[in-house]
Amino acid sequence: MKKIAIVGALLTSFVASSVWADAASDLKSRLDKVSSFHASFTQKVTDGSGNAVQEGQGDLWVKRPNLFNWHMTQPDESILVSDGKTLWFYNPFVEQATATLLKDATSNTPFMLIARNQTSDWQQYNIKQNGDDFVLTPKTSNGNLKQFTINVSNNGTINQFSAVEQDEQRSSYQLKSQQNGAIDASKFTFTPPQGVTVDDQRNK
């Protein structure tokens, strides 16, 4: 009887691992169908009680695996640009820009996960799939991300994604008008405007 219980536990573990592996493979495969795209997005942030904290909108350009431009236009403008080596964050309101090496940037944020779409990143999560919905839970609790959900059509179109932080704050993004195809290289370059304070962390 004890042997049967042990075998049953092993089979359950094997099946669960296979499901997670299949979900991760399907998610990566879907995202791989689109190598570059532009989409507009709306953002809604709520606290742990479901109260609205912020609403915003902007545009997103991605050319996988390492080029992207995340441009928040409302309520306050901010820009996150990767040229493949350097990750720039620019806040026009305070006239400050920060430069970090992309390889040193955290990979446990929803946007980085989507833009990079790397197997090594997905392996850090337990992934469950329900149709076009994928729910990701970090295997370790070291970071601030508690859960990440993304809806991706079979053709690679990202419809929405959301992130829940450890304090239960939820950030939801609805993407629309995704256009696949070539993107002007200028979208993935950034030069700090004159007079902007630059915090260059690339050599620290």
UniProtKB/Swiss-Prot annotation:
Region of interest (Disordered), residue spans: 169-204
Signal sequence extent: 1-21
Cited Pfam families: LolA
GO biological process, one term: lipoprotein localization to outer membrane
Compositional bias ranges of the Polar residues kind: 171-181
This protein's UniProt keywords: Chaperone, Periplasm, Protein transport, Signal, Transport
InterPro entries linked to this entry: LolA/LolB/LppX, OM_lipoprot_carrier_LolA-like, OM_lipoprot_carrier_LolA_Pbac
GO cellular component terms listed in the entry, alphabetical order: outer membrane-bounded periplasmic space
Superkingdom of the source species: Bacteria
Keyword presence, Protein transport: yes
Presence of keyword Signal: yes
Protein location: Periplasm
Function description: Participates in the translocation of lipoproteins from the inner membrane to the outer membrane. Only forms a complex with a lipoprotein if the residue after the N-terminal Cys is not an aspartate (The Asp acts as a targeting signal to indicate that the lipoprotein should stay in the inner membrane).
Quaternary context: Monomer.
Listed PANTHER family: OUTER-MEMBRANE LIPOPROTEIN CARRIER PROTEIN
Protein family according to the UniProt entry: Belongs to the LolA family.
HAMAP family according to UniProt: LolA (MF_00240)
Protein's UniProt name: Outer-membrane lipoprotein carrier protein
Organism: Enterobacter sp. (strain 638)
Gene from which this protein is expressed: lolA
